[in-house]
Regions:
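Compositional signal for N-terminal targeting/processing segments
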Residues: 1-228
């Protein structure tokens, strides 16, 4: 993938990546941000929209003191694209990547089970906000609605997203915007937002939408692979 200019994010503690679940390129983008952030002074915390109780198991695995028992994870049954063969391969990559780092990258899972959308997003935000007083850089990837900075209405109901609760001055929100392709969420689906060609490259630009600070245009999306 094309190298990106990360200079706009140097002073930001919280970097939110708003994804469409079930796209393989999400993981490649996340890896690019990790590779950039680990060159800086602060330790990096990678935050995943996975059940928070998996945090300890995953970090033990990254440190080489535990196994990754993903086949027992209940949430893989949702088949909503948040976890896949590519995500497990990503954790294997992160474990190997960590071997060469003085300050190890850790993972924080932040999904919680609650009654409603707004309550869930507030609780997920609180998990990230616990890191505010720590000298760390947080890279969090989540569904793009959760990464929004502003309240919004959907089906005539007000939604207050995770991104709304984070400190504006130290947070940047980036929407991953795919031009065309396929994704897997319950089933494989195809879409075309805009025409593209083989020469189209990644493009990071300031967002015209007040919900996000930046938009990262991605030429083509490919679906993730189901865990078996």
């Amino acid at each position: 993938m094309t190298d990106l200019d990360f200079s706009s994010f140097l002073q930001k503690q919280f970097i939110l990546l708003g994804e469409m679940h079930g796209v393989r390129e999400n993981i490649e983008i996340l890896k690019m941000f990790i590779e950039w952030a680990t060159q800086l002074e602060e330790p990096v915390v990678v935050c995943l929209e996975w059940p928070d109780q998996l945090t300890e198991e995953i970090n033990d695995y990254l440190l080489g003191v535990g196994l990754l028992r993903w086949s027992s994870w209940e949430f893989i049954k949702h088949k909503d694209g948040r976890v896949s063969q590519e995500h497990i391969a990503f954790l294997e990559w992160l474990k190997d990547f960590n071997l060469h780092l003085v300050k190890k990258t850790t993972v924080q899972c932040f999904d919680v089970e609650t009654g409603g959308w707004n309550e869930r997003d507030k609780k997920m935000a609180n998990i990230l906000l616990k890191r505010k007083s720590e000298r760390v850089r947080v890279i969090a990837i989540m569904g793009n609605f959760h990464a929004k900075k502003e309240k919004f209405f959907l089906d005539q109901e007000e939604h207050i997203p995770l991104g709304y609760y984070l400190p504006t001055a130290s947070t940047t929100t980036i929407k991953l915007d795919y031009l065309s392709g396929s994704f897997f969420n319950k089933s494989q689906k195809e879409f075309i937002n805009r025409e593209t060609n083989d020469d189209t490259e990644l493009l990071l630009k300031e967002s015209q939408d007040p919900d996000y600070d930046f938009v990262l245009l991605i030429p083509r999306a490919h679906p993730v692979s189901l865990l078996k």
